[in-house]
Amino acid sequence: MGDILAHESELLGLVKEYLDFAEFEDTLKTFSKECKIKGKPLCKTVGGSFRDSKSLTIQKDLVTAFDNGDQKVFFNLWEEHIPSSVRDGDSFAQRLEFYLHIHFAIYLLKYSVGRPDKEELDEKISYFKTYLETKGAALSQTTEFLPFYALPFVPNPMVHPSFKELFQDSWTPELKMKLEKFLALIFKASNTPKLLTIYKENGQSNKEMLQQLHQQLVEAERRSMTYLKRYNKIQADYHNLIGVTAELVDSLEATVSGKMITPEYLQSVCVRLFSNQMRQSLAHSVDFTRPGTASTMLRASLAPVKLKDVPLLPSLDYEKLKKDLILGSDRLKAFLLQALRWRLTTSHPGEQRETVLQAYISNDLLDCYSHNQRSVLQLLHSKSDVVRQYMARLINAFASLAEGRLYLAQNTKVLRMLEGRLKEEDKDIITRENVLGALQKFSLRRPLQTAMIQDGLIFWLVDVLKDPDCLSDYTLEYSVALLMNLCLRSTGKNMCAKVAGLVLKVLSDLLGHENHEIQPYVSGALYSILSVPSIREEARAMGMEDILRCFIKEGNAEMIRQIEFIIKQLNSEELPDGVLESDDDEDEDDEEDHDIMEADLDKDELIQPQLGELSGEKLLTTEYLGIMTNTGKMRRKGLANVQWSGDEPLQRPVTPGGHRNGYPV
């Protein structure tokens, strides 16, 4: 009862607010009258209406101060009402604040009638200078803002070419629009009554918790089976080891007594200790009587730490699967695409995963060989956001494996569909990420590189990378890596030469980006395109060497060495030997054709099964079990001896997953 009394005023206020919102006018009058008779106080500031009116007033005051050039009023309101976590932690807020300081610093120069008041102008410039030396110093290494640090020291910024953009008529309205959008996002005005909000959040929370617990149960059961298999294997190995140890102790005792150990006995002990894969092949081919052989082979057998005896997954009825992928409900399609992807991503690398992939390919799961109008590939253009995303994820999983890329490359329409989806997809970030990831992995293959260059993908990438802060880390990293792979080809360099100034500006800006994972790809792209004389001339004209030397002062040792190579390339007069490769030779280069199954493929799943609903492997083996037709296939063996030193810029096609994992490049 005490708790109710403590919150009675607020609870009654919630009821009053909802009755007012739902227009129960008579009920509200009766309710208010009875509260007054009983002496029950009503909270007057409950819900969103009061907060909304206050937030709208703050937004209006900020915009007014912006329009009037009232610097102190604006930043007092800014610091009071914009959370410090946003001001200090959000990159967009930091960039916006920087440009707002520029706006107030040049306000008198732009809008004064006649000559601006010198004292007032000096005060504004001094305020801006103080900002640059304190909070604004954090952005001093960003190429975008570097020229503005000279603004307080330029006698007449209006005529200086570096600041020409600031004094254009469109600059201030565009900045004001960004400010208004930012403020609307921060304050999030809402007229929804608090009682309704509490009800909806509570109901949704319970539903999400139930689904989450169900999913956790499914995952726990799957992990439990995996751990049980591992435990049984470890226990068997332990018992085997104890048995061998006991025999060795007996043998040592026999040796002390003068009995000799036979080569056959030594061989039998060693074979029992070797991993399963080596036992049969070594049993008859190794001479264990030679001193040192047994111990050397034992140590070698420990090198590849692999799970043993991984069973093959059950075969599936692919005809029924493909039929339901084309004709089933959107929810069924999504669960099937998810389950098929999980088969690839969660299977054990080696024979199990190879068998899964080979079954998909031999049954033409994605209809790459089909010419029918209705095919599984068409799911990439589904009206359902979930189906489109899950189809893109599955294609990305295929593209993560060398044999999968070879399968997808057989049909040029796959590439064209992915390129189209990349440029059209504006609703779902994860769909776009997976399409981009697949295309980036496609760029490991020379024929696909050629097709992407001819389709003008370089121009699209450069345009997207002009504003990297709007991109997710995955999109940024894979976009830059794809651009680098295409720039390694002579046709790609020639494409870049058509917009040399723009490409150089975008790449030089990216060198200073806070995401350091992209630096090797940016360096590789710059180094490659600077082998073209016309691009070198453009780079020299824009002072590229000075820009690069700025990064040397702040970069790490690896980045510094790469930039030194780029500067050397920039100042060269002739093409280095072997830089420009012929585009006529479309032979595959398997050195870089690795399997790269990154964890991002299964992140942020959109759908969860309801109670009693099948998903994952259980869905496949319950509804789509087929006749056992699994057959293994030998992997293609590529060269694996070309390593990247890290000192020089990348000069071979790579993909971020493989590059991070240290695969040869």
From Swiss-Prot:
A Gene Ontology cellular component where this protein is annotated is:
cilium
- Has keyword DNA-binding? no
What InterPro entries does the annotation carry?
ARM-like, ARM-type_fold, ARMC9, ARMC9_ARM_dom, ARMC9_CTLH-like_dom, ARMC9_LisH, LisH
Q: Which residues form a coiled coil?
A: 201-235
Annotated spans, Disordered: 642-665
A Pfam family cross-referenced in the UniProt record is ARMC9_LisH
Q: Which ranges carry the LisH domain?
A: 7-39
Q: Which residues carry this modification: Phosphoserine?
A: S582
Subcellular location per UniProt equals: Cytoplasm, Cytoskeleton, Cilium basal body; Cell projection, Cilium; Cytoplasm, Cytoskeleton, Microtubule organizing center, Centrosome, Centriole
GO biological process: what's one of them? cilium assembly
Q: Which UniProt keywords apply?
A: Cell projection, Cilium biogenesis/degradation, Coiled coil, Cytoplasm, Cytoskeleton, Phosphoprotein
According to its UniProt entry, the function of this protein is described as:
Involved in ciliogenesis. It is required for appropriate acetylation and polyglutamylation of ciliary microtubules, and regulation of cilium length. Acts as a positive regulator of hedgehog (Hh)signaling. May participate in the trafficking and/or retention of GLI2 and GLI3 proteins at the ciliary tip.
Known partners and oligomeric status: Interacts with TOGARAM1, CCDC66, CEP104, CSPP1 and CEP290. Interacts with NDUFAF2.
| Stated name of the protein | LisH domain-containing protein ARMC9
- What is this protein's gene name? ARMC9
